[in-house]
């Protein structure tokens, strides 16, 4: 493995067998080296293989200016997230989370901590991601000796949601607001007190996450068969009426008209949450 470029003493780039650029990280990898020299395999700690040349360039920039210990800490957090969340996280997370952690630590050392305006929503809508965010604060404290405020757990959680949805951070924040607006409509329309540990609640939140993404992306879901919609409308009257209230709100604030398919699935999820809470109350 030959060095193509030396970014700093700890980070170099190489070309793989398909002539794709890879970023290789390890303490002392680039020290007293020149392009064309062989990489010392014993020093390699991490190899980043990003298929996009743009991502590779952005990652190279991040790794060139951020201390190795911060990079390896962010990598540990991402490994934990992959283990806990399952599924794929976008490669761009290596860039965004490393960059975020670096600046959060720098700001904290300067006494400038930022309040997370979506902290309340993140705690309730992204419980798994927020729990990982709290673990991440412990990892940062243990490895770097810096105790970041709890608001940073919320920011880290949003980065994880971003990596799952393959969206940009501003869009993730808009998605979160849409989700909270809908949950509030259901809560007050049906006079519910959510059980945030219930399976039906988690399924509803997951549905809302992807629904909000489609809404903001203007990608509606249609169905040629409307017979099930009519059954749901007739059978789940309260839930369907609540879904219509949501439709009115979305039309007013987002200029988006729900399809019958979207109305139907909202009603189904609302009914699941409502009926489960009703059963628990009866017990």
Swiss-Prot record:
It holds the Pfam family PRD. One of its GO terms (molecular function) is RNA binding. The keyword Transcription regulation applies. InterPro entries: BglG_antiterminators, CAT_RNA-bd_dom, CAT_RNA-bd_dom_sf, PRD, PRD_sf, Transcrpt_antitermin_CS. Residues 65-170, 171-280 form the PRD domain. Keywords: Activator, Phosphoprotein, Repeat, RNA-binding, Transcription, Transcription regulation. PROSITE patterns: PRD_1, PRD_2. Phosphorylated and inactivated by ArbF (EII-Bgl). The degree of phosphorylation is dependent on the presence or absence of beta-glucosides which act as inducers of the operon expression. Addition of inducer result in the rapid dephosphorylation of ArbG. Mediates the positive regulation of the beta-glucoside (arb) operon by functioning as a transcriptional antiterminator. This is an RNA-binding protein that recognizes a specific sequence located just upstream of two termination sites within the operon. NCBIfam families: LicT (NF046042), PRK09772.1 (NF007295). PANTHER family: CRYPTIC BETA-GLUCOSIDE BGL OPERON ANTITERMINATOR. Belongs to the transcriptional antiterminator BglG family. This is Beta-glucoside operon antiterminator.
